[in-house]
């Protein structure tokens, strides 16, 4: 649902959120599309550094020594600013001890991410030493590091007043004239504060009877030299940018607000502040804060801030990146706003807010303001009145400062509106630099880091921004944590969880023609007519000869012949009725594809079988009128560039053969089909013949085997004996009695085969068991057992023998049985038993 409502919601809020006619600008005009997309595989001129540590989020560039100092988790690195990946780097291992990690884990902290020494602060302390602070497993420590030897000292300083305990908390810090100015959440209780340490007069914000800071997350701080060329002898000031809970937008007391709405703020303190003498002792006497508005009510969370021209206060301005408020958790969008220092100064010189006890709400203070003005720095005018420092200020002024830290007016962006609203993007950090072009004008060039590892390079043009390119700087998606620009090295350094990458500030060689070079509108790039190439302005001796058009991006190449070689003519031939694709890739995301037929007829999507897509032109159901010369043009910013040229020929389709007369039913089968049928029938006949022969052969073999075996018969019992089924064993002839046996076999079936005769009549009781056989037969063999043993897998059952048909003589039964048993020893097992097993 949100995916469908989001464009409409953004458009409505963009046009109506902030009053004023200048803010009724459609969101589609503010949502700039990057002109070029450079994936990770197409990066050129980059350098990488990755050590054994993680979270390379703290960067310090020292241009004079050409060193890039990096603070990571458990380590510090000193890299060559010229090439961070040259391998000639120095490293300091600064890990938290196992005992400290164990204590951190026992306090309920995560031993996978939090219980380490995350280096959060790294600045130049003096000409010989650096100053670094780390979380040290929720026991912060700081150290002065020898810059030349790049080694840790033997002793450390406690860092609980200088560094956050939690590595995930916002932090910003500066070293100014030896004093350490930091803003973060201090101590284990995570108390937000702005503090000054390593100074004869340590200061912090007020906590009672009201908090000057409410659940603040700090983003950025900067020193502005307002004392330079000041006609009133003003003091230098430190500006802090952060997001906090807004107490003025809901009912609440001094100590607790009932509102959870978070807003962006800007605060300032004077560098020469010494605190109060009796009131606000060791507290800031110059602290003031104001709301920072970019685009309400959506964009309230401050993500990144950069300052330009901070050395000259009259030209100092800031760029800030905002994301959606915390209640919009399912949407991603960012806004970029610009703020002038003069506007911030005007707000701090305006009316104050006051907590009104009667209504228990914050409102505009309407009473009188004491003198000297509360929150102001000591100037020449105040010195002439005897106020040489903040400790000389009257108690009335200090009491007013204590209760009125918030200004009534908000700080609005330049021209009252954002420069950019970007959907589906979350900016995490930004930096910028002013670039003076060969023609004279100066443009602000910004580099915006995203939460998924991309860098947007943009130039500020009046009330908007033009995104020159978007570059994927990491193969894996990860957040950009820090950005630093080196003008001497012409490089951008990117800090991220996995490492540091060095990018060139410009990639002018990507643009191959004059039009492509000026359409990019990169302040660093211009077309050189002498070398017929797009070159960086910093590398050209005669910079005035370069062709540039940053404002409009379409002028300067009219008289130049460096429009690039025309594309070769490609031929395509297709049959009538077929489809054909004419490829054409647009190099710019801002270009519109334009197709012309025979140089004049423009083709649109859906017209006469044409389909215009991002990858080319599709001609469907080609007809003879589709033949001709096709040109693919890129139309961008009023310029037209030929990208591809085709000559298409549509050939007539081959006529189909005339259908034959229908064949008769008897002749409808093709000759080859008949032949297959005949062969199949012949094969089946042959198989049947082979099968019949095999069966006949097997039958003959079995008949022969039966003739050689002894014959068994199943005789019918005497009718007088009853109708029960009886089995009789008829012994075969003994050797020497073949003739007699044959005669008997010819005379009746009872003596030659085994018969099963079903019983008839009523069932009769079983006959009495036969008398036991004698101990020894007449042939000298002992009586057979009542059950024969299993031999060679065949079972033999001794059947009751009748007195009839028992052959006399010593060899009638015993010899026959011995011969059968001897034969069975050498008989192969069969799967199915036959009558020979009985």
Swiss-Prot record:
Residues 35-505 form the Sema domain. Residues 736-745 have a biased composition (Acidic residues). It comes from the Eukaryota. It is a single-pass type I membrane protein. GO terms for biological process: axon guidance; negative chemotaxis; neural crest cell migration; positive regulation of cell migration; semaphorin-plexin signaling pathway. Keywords: Cell membrane, Developmental protein, Differentiation, Disulfide bond, Glycoprotein, Immunoglobulin domain, Membrane, Neurogenesis, Phosphoprotein, Signal, Transmembrane, Transmembrane helix. GO terms for molecular function: chemorepellent activity; neuropilin binding; semaphorin receptor binding. The modification Phosphoserine is found at residues 795, 837. The keyword Signal applies. The chain crosses the membrane at residues 676-696. InterPro entries: Ig-like_dom (IPR007110), Ig-like_dom_sf (IPR036179), Ig-like_fold (IPR013783), Ig_sub (IPR003599), Plexin_repeat (IPR002165), PSI (IPR016201), Semap_dom (IPR001627), Semap_dom_sf (IPR036352). Cell surface receptor for PLXNB2. May play a role in axon guidance. Interacts with PLXNB2. This is Semaphorin-4G. The lineage of its organism: Eukaryota, Metazoa, Chordata, Craniata, Vertebrata.
């Amino acid at each position: 649902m949100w995916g469908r409502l989001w464009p409409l919601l953004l458009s409505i809020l963009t046009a109506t959120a902030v009053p004023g006619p200048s803010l009724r600008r459609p969101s589609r005009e503010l949502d700039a599309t990057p002109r070029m997309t450079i994936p990770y595989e197409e990066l050129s001129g980059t350098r990488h550094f990755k050590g054994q540590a993680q979270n390379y989020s703290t960067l310090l560039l020292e241009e004079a020594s050409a060193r890039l100092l990096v603070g990571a988790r458990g380590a510090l690195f000193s890299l060559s600013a010229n090439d961070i990946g040259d391998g000639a780097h120095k490293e300091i291992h600064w890990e938290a001890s196992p005992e400290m990690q164990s204590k951190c884990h026992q306090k309920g902290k995560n031993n996978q991410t939090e219980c380490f020494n995350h280096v959060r602060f790294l600045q130049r302390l003096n000409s010989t030493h650096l100053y670094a602070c780390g979380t040290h497993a929720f026991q912060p420590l700081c150290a002065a590091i020898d810059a030349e030897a790049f080694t840790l000292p033997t002793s450390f300083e406690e860092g609980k007043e200088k560094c956050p305990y939690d590595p995930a908390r916002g932090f910003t810090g500066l070293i100014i004239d030896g004093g350490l100015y930091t803003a973060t959440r201090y101590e284990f209780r995570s108390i937000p504060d702005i503090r000054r340490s390593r100074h004869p007069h340590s200061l912090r914000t007020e906590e009672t009877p009201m908090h000057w800071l409410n659940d603040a997350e700090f983003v950025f701080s900067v020193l502005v030299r307002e004392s330079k060329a000041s006609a009133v002898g003003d003091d230098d000031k430190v500006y802090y940018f952060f997001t906090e809970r807004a107490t003025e937008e809901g009912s609440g007391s001094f100590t607790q607000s009932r509102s959870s709405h978070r807003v962006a703020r800007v605060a300032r303190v004077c560098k020469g502040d010494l605190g109060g003498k009796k009131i606000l002792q060791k507290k800031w006497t110059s602290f003031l804060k104001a709301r920072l508005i970019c685009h309400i009510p959506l964009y309230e969370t401050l993500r990144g801030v950069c300052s330009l021209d901070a050395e000259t206060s009259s030209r100092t301005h800031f760029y800030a990146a905002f994301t959606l408020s915390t209640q919009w958790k399912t949407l991603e969008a960012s806004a970029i706003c610009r703020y002038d220092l003069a506007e911030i100064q005007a707000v701090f010189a305006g009316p104050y807010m006051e907590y009104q006890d009667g209504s228990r709400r914050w409102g505009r203070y309407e009473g009188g303001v004491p003198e000297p003005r509360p929150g102001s720095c000591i100037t020449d005018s105040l010195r002439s009145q005897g106020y040489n420092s903040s400790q000389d200020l009257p108690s009335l002024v200090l009491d007013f400062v204590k209760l009125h830290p918030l200004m009534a007016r908000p700080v609005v962006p330049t021209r009252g509106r954002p420069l950019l609203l970007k959907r589906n993007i979350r900016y995490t950090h930004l930096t910028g630099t002013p670039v003076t072009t060969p023609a004279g004008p100066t443009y602000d060039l910004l580099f915006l880091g995203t939460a998924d590892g991309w860098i947007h390079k943009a130039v500020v043009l009046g009330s908007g921004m033009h995104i020159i390119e978007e570059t994927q700087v990491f193969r894996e998606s990860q957040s950009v944590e820090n950005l630093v620009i080196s003008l001497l090295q012409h490089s951008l350094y990117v800090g991220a969880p996995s490492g540091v990458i060095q990018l060139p500030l410009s990639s002018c060689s990507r643009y191959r023609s004059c039009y492509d070079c000026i359409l990019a509108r990169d302040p660093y790039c211009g077309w050189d007519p002498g070398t017929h190439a797009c070159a960086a302005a910093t590398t050209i001796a005669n910079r005035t000869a370069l062709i540039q058009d940053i404002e409009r991006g379409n002028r300067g190449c009219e008289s130049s012949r460096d429009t690039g070689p025309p594309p070769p003519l490609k031929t395509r031939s297709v049959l009538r009725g077929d489809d054909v694709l004419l490829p054409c890739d647009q190099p710019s995301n801002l270009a519109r594809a334009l197709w012309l037929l025979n140089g004049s007829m423009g083709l649109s999507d859906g017209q006469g079988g044409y389909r215009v897509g991002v990858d080319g032109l599709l001609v469907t159901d080609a007809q003879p009128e589709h033949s001709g010369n096709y040109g693919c043009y890129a139309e961008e910013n009023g310029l037209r560039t030929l990208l591809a040229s085709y000559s298409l020929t549509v050939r007539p389709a081959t006529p189909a053969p005339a259908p034959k007369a229908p064949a008769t039913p008897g002749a409808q089968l093709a000759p080859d089909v008949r032949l297959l049928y005949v062969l199949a029938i012949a094969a089946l006949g042959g198989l049947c013949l082979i099968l019949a022969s095999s069966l006949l052969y097997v039958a003959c073999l079995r008949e022969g085997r039966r003739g050689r075996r002894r014959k068994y018969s199943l005789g019918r019992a005497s009718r007088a004996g009853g109708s029960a089924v009886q089995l009789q064993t008829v012994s075969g002839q003994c050797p020497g009695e073949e003739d007699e046996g044959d005669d008997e076999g010819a005379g009746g079936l009872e003596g030659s085969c085994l018969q099963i005769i079903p019983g008839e009549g009523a069932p009769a009781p079983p006959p009495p068991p036969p008398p036991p056989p004698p101990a020894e037969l007449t042939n000298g063999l002992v009586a057979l057992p009542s059950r024969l043993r299993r031999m060679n897998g065949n079972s033999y059952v001794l059947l009751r023998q009748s007195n009839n048909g028992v052959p006399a003589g010593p060899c009638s039964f015993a010899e026959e049985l011995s011969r059968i048993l001897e034969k069975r020893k050498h008989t192969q097992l069969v799967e199915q038993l036959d009558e020979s097993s009985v």
